[in-house]
Design a protein with these regions (language model features):
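N-terminal pre-P-loop "Q-motif" helix
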Residues: 2-16, 221
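A basic/glycine-biased coupling hinge at the interface between accessory DNA-binding modules
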Residues: 17-20, 28, 39-209, 234, ...
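Short glycine-/polar-rich loops that comprise or flank the Walker A/P-loop
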Residues: 18, 46-50, 75-78, 232-235, ...
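Helicase P-loop NTPase motor core
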Residues: 22, 26-34, 96, 102, ...
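Conserved helicase motor core of SF1/SF2 NTP-dependent helicases
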Residues: 28, 216-292, 299-304, 440
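Hydrophobic residues in beta-strands of the RecA-like P-loop NTPase core, especially within AAA+ ATPase
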Residues: 48, 211-218, 239-240, 573
Length: 664
């Protein structure tokens, strides 16, 4: 990309007052526009303290902060660049007491929420053979994304009646435990702004200039939040691409970006169409597909780089042949063009497609990484420690309490826990409150009572250690005290003894050491480090960053959703078949259009060359089933100029000949 912004970028960067929509096509430099606009505003005399920039991931926020420091040669004081959830957490920490919560609230991860839902299903006697917690977690997520409170749910069938009841009980328990789930961070901030206009006014005065990245991915709740904040001064600048709106299943509303100028009548619309990533051939093919959508802004992204060669469309006999072909094609490119394997990515619509590619790559000794594999903060040993740390901040957190009350083993068995649960429900109190009265409960055996006594003593002692006195000159040392706690309960021994193999146990110990190293780094980098702030930080990171656990090596294997925002010189899109892409569950025109956007996103990840494969048959339910090529392949071929036609057989023959020559 040029050192200087192009005409359209410059126009967006230098827009100061009033609403702005920057329609940023794939690879058109939208991050540059946001960061340079922030720097421009500050240079023009806007106080950094009055600027709020919101994005979807901590990684994107960190990159923006780094770029702005480079542009301004200093770190602007008071500037807020954060995710939606981090921003709302900041607000709630200061204001949540107005909504009847205490400031030491716990944030539930999605697995914590599912654990709570599972216990609710048992409590209200729902048959979990027919309905599991994942189904009701989906309902609750849908309701919250659409700002529907439990009393506002209008059930249309018996299942939705159960979902409404589960939602009601779930919210009651969360409030009783002084806890929020991830959606509550945004929804309660909206409630706060609506119920307390003076609070909204305070934040409107603070953030007079608002910028939102990836606006096409916002849901109703995020739209409502930003609309409230921007309603006073209307200095809202949003950047996004309607053609890359692929999160409808998470509640994203493409209408938010398509109707921006209807909401803000005097909005300035700037279209960024110069692509600095892909070749002309790749962009022509991608446009031939996406132009079939009706719900989109009319635009065409053009290449600033080389013309390139047309994408390859390859027919394979079946899915094993497809995996074999892609593996050997990568080997061919890596040998003939002297490329390392980090230049290649294989994208697919469904995670289940990765298995055969893994087998094919292992068979040929190819290094690869499956993006989106088991995440660090979801590992058992890490979740156990975090559950304890949550209890040290908020002893009422029932999900954390149930997770570790008998870790390490204290003689508190399932029967004792069930009895305690029944008593807490009967008395209308938290499980922690019931535990405090354990000596007065006859149904608890002596060994369990001893275990409860030891457990409570640990929780109370460390709760006292980590309860921060605002006037204290010195904050409690996190690393030192957490290390001391782990030694006290002999957790390392517990992990080793409960592991199937010594090797597995040692890996878990390494994970614990990694967690402790992270705590030490956090403490070194934050003068006012507290356990509560640390827990909030890593919860947000683990929820928002689903692919960024470690440096990826080798060929990237990932879903198209995981690939958004990334780029690779050589990209393979596997499974270009009817029923896969587009997905067999996408039947309405709206759903097909989202699948088409998904295809467009996948195609525009490629910088130099793109290969699309489809199978003539696949094994389903143990039987070979005939497959039809994706309609998107047909659209692509129809929309391409004649000089971009691909001779498929010639390509495969050339590939096989070159492989044979190299191996001989």
């Amino acid at each position: 990309m040029s050192l200087l912004p192009n005409k359209e970028q410059k126009e967006a960067i230098e827009h100061i007052d009033g609403p702005l929509l920057a329609l940023a096509g794939a690879g058109s430099g939208k991050t540059r526009v946001i960061t340079e606009r922030i720097a421009y505003l500050i240079k023009k005399g806007i106080y950094p303290n009055n600027i709020l920039a919101v994005t979807f991931t901590n990684k994107a926020a960190a990159e923006m902060r780094e770029r702005i420091v480079l542009l301004l040669k200093e770190k602007p004081k008071g500037l807020i660049i954060s995710t939606f959830h981090s921003f709302c957490l900041r607000v709630l920490k200061a204001e949540i007491n107005k909504l009847g919560y205490k400031n030491n609230f716990t944030i539930y991860s999605s697995s914590d929420s599912r654990t709570l839902i599972r216990s609710i299903l048992r409590e209200i006697k729902v048959n979990t053979l027919n309905y599991d917690e994942n189904l009701f977690a989906w309902y609750i997520d849908k309701y919250k994304n659409n700002l529907i409170k439990p009393n506002e749910v209008e059930p249309h069938d018996d299942l939705e009646k159960i979902a409404k009841r589960v939602y009601e009980v779930y919210q009651n328990y969360l409030k009783g435990y002084n806890s929020l789930d991830f959606n509550d961070l945004i929804n309660l901030t909206i409630d706060l702004f609506i119920e307390f206009p003076e609070v909204l006014d305070k934040y409107q005065e603070r953030f007079k200039y608002i910028m939102i990245d990836e606006y096409q991915d916002t849901n109703l709740a995020q739209y409502k939040l930003t609309s409230l904040l921007a309603s006073k001064y209307k200095n809202i600048a949003v950047v996004g691409d309607d053609d890359q709106s692929i999160y409808g299943f998470r509640g994203a509303e493409i209408s938010n970006i398509l109707s921006f100028e209807k909401q803000y009548k005097d909005a300035k619309i700037i279209t960024l169409t110069k692509n600095y990533r892909s070749t002309k051939a790749i962009l022509e093919a991608a446009h031939a597909v996406i132009s079939n959508n009706t719900q989109r802004k009319d635009k065409k992204v053009t290449a600033e780089g080389e013309d390139g060669i047309p994408p390859d469309i390859i027919s394979c006999e079946d899915e094993r042949e497809e995996a074999k072909f892609i593996a050997e094609s990568i080997i061919n490119y890596s040998i003939t063009k002297k490329l390392n394997y980090e230049n290649f990515a294989v994208l697919f619509r469904m995670n289940a497609q990765s298995r055969l590619f893994e087998e094919a790559f292992r068979l040929r000794g190819l290094p690869y990484t499956v993006v989106g594999a088991f995440q660090f903060y979801e590992r058992k040993e890490i979740k156990d420690i975090l559950a304890y740390l949550n209890l040290f901040v908020n002893p009422e957190d029932e999900v954390s309490l149930l997770r570790v009350i008998n870790i390490p083993k204290r003689g508190i068995g399932a029967t004792a826990i069930n009895n305690l649960n029944e008593i807490s429900v009967k008395n209308g109190e938290s499980l922690y409150q019931t535990l405090l009265n354990y000596n007065n409960i006859d149904d608890i055996p002596p060994r369990a009572k001893t275990g409860i006594k030891d457990f409570l003593e640990i929780i109370e002692r460390y709760n006292n250690i980590f309860t921060v006195d605002k006037n204290a000159l010195e904050k409690p040392k996190l690393y030192e005290n957490i290390n001391k706690f782990l030694d006290e309960i002999a957790y390392h021994n517990e992990v080793l003894n409960s592991s199937d193999t010594r090797e597995q146990g040692n890996k878990k110990i390494e994970n614990i050491e990694s967690l402790m190293n992270g705590i030490a780094e956090y403490e070194r980098g934050n003068k006012n480090a507290t356990l509560k702030n640390y827990l909030d930080r890593i919860l947000l990171m683990s929820m928002e960053e689903n692919n960024e656990e470690e440096k990826k090596k080798g060929i990237m294997l990932m879903s198209i959703h995981s690939a958004k925002g990334l780029e690779f010189p050589y990209v393979y899109i596997a499974g270009m078949e009817d029923g896969i892409l587009p997905h067999h569950k996408s039947v309405s025109e709206k759903e097909i259009e989202e699948e088409r956007r998904l295809c467009y996103v996948a195609m525009t990840r490629a910088k130099k060359h793109l290969t699309l494969t489809h199978c003539l048959s696949r094994t389903r339910m143990g039987k070979k089933v005939e497959c039809l090529p994706s309609i998107f392949l047909e659209e692509m071929q129809k929309g391409l100029p004649e000089n971009m036609a691909m001779n498929e057989e010639e390509f495969i023959d050339n590939l096989r000949l070159s492989l044979k020559a190299e191996r001989n």
